[in-house]
């Protein structure tokens, strides 16, 4: 009986050590973008866009990442739906890729891929528009979003 209890405790310990606890974080991404209009009318707006910027985070592991995002927006009346993908490049060359969706000013995101320290990453969270700035150059737009979420990495 003692062996059985000992084996159960050891097994639990081994499985617990294989998975790292989820790390929560907050970050801000500020970026500039360009859009390609597909349809622009009172009834329907459809466009694609590309954003380039930088991520700043309260977690050093996520801080100072370069960002590129592509996405689409569809607006029918007052309803806005957007979706896309972002790639983050860290100072050491590692990357991660996320998928996101949402309404006009916020939504959800999740990790799809990671390399190096991000290999086999899992997690996701929410994004929220915090600021839109007046375009610095005609044909561009600038904004900042807040990201909140968590990630898990295997040990």
Describe the role of every protein-language-model region:
Residues 4-13:
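Sec-dependent N-terminal signal peptides
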Residues 15-21:
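Sec/Tat signal peptide C-region and signal peptidase I cleavage site
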Residues 21-155:
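Beta-strand-enriched cores of mature, soluble protein domains
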């Amino acid at each position: 009986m003692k062996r059985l209890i000992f084996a159960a405790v050891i097994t639990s310990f081994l499985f617990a050590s294989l998975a790292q606890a989820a790390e929560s974080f907050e970050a801000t991404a500020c970026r500039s973008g360009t859009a390609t209009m597909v349809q622009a009318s009172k009834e329907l707006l459809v466009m694609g866009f590309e954003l380039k910027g930088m991520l700043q985070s309260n977690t050093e592991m996520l801080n100072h990442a370069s960002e590129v995002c592509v996405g689409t927006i569809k607006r029918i009346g007052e309803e806005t739906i957007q979706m896309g993908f972002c790639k983050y490049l860290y100072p050491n060359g590692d990357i991660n890729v996320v998928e996101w969706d949402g309404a006009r000013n916020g939504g959800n995101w999740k990790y799809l891929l990671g390399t190096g320290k991000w290999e086999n990453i899992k997690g996701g969270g929410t994004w929220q528009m915090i600021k839109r700035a007046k375009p610095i150059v005609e044909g561009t737009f600038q904004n900042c979003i807040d990201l909140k979420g968590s990630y898990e990495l295997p040990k």
